C-alpha cells in the first residue's frame, strides 16, 4: 500500500476505531476504551508482570475507577500511566484533596513508556511515597501528574528497560 497516494481521510480510517487493527485489539480485550495509548500500556505492564516469576501477577480492574487500574494476587492496588516518551508527563491523578491529605489510593504506580512504534521501552515502579515525592500540581486542571525526568528514573525502581 502506497500511503503517499492515500487521502487524509483514507489515512485517518486506517488508524480509526473502525480499522482492522483496532477492532482486532478490541476483540482480544486489549482495547476496552478509546484510550489506545493507555490501554496498550496497561496490557504491556500486566503482560510483563505475568510473564516474570519474580513479579506479582496483575489483573485489570474495571475501567472508570480513578487511579486504580490493576490489582495483584496479594491484594495490592496498582495505578498505571502510559506515556510515549522518556520526557513525557503522565495523565492526571484526580481528587487532589485526598492526595494532599495523603490518602493512599494505590500501593504502586507503574509508569509505562512506549516508543514511537508503541512498543515497550521502559516500566518504572513507584511506591506511594515515591509518587508523593514526585507529583506536581497542575493548577489549570486542578489535578496532579508526574513528569518523566532523569532524577525520577534514577530514584525509582526500573522494572524494564529496553
Feature-to-residue mapping (PLM):
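Nucleic-acid endonuclease domains
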Residues: 1-77, 81-162
Amino acid at each position: 500500500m502506497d500511503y503517499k497516494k492515500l487521502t487524509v481521510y483514507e489515512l485517518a480510517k486506517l488508524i480509526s476505531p473502525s480499522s482492522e487493527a483496532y477492532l482486532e485489539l478490541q476483540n482480544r480485550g486489549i482495547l476496552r476504551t478509546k484510550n489506545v495509548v493507555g490501554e496498550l500500556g496497561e496490557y504491556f505492564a500486566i503482560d510483563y508482570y505475568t510473564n516474570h516469576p519474580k513479579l506479582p501477577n496483575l489483573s485489570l480492574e474495571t475501567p472508570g475507577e480513578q487511579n486504580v487500574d490493576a490489582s495483584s494476587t496479594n491484594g495490592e492496588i496498582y495505578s498505571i500511566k502510559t506515556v510515549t516518551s522518556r520526557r513525557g508527563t503522565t495523565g492526571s491523578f484526580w481528587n487532589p484533596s485526598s492526595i494532599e491529605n495523603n490518602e493512599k489510593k494505590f500501593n504502586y504506580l507503574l509508569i509505562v513508556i512506549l516508543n514511537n512504534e508503541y512498543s515497550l521501552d521502559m516500566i518504572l515502579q513507584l511506591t506511594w511515597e515515591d509518587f508523593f515525592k514526585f507529583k506536581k500540581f497542575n493548577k489549570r486542571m486542578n489535578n496532579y501528574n508526574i513528569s518523566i525526568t532523569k532524577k525520577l528514573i534514577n530514584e525509582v525502581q526500573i522494572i524494564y528497560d529496553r
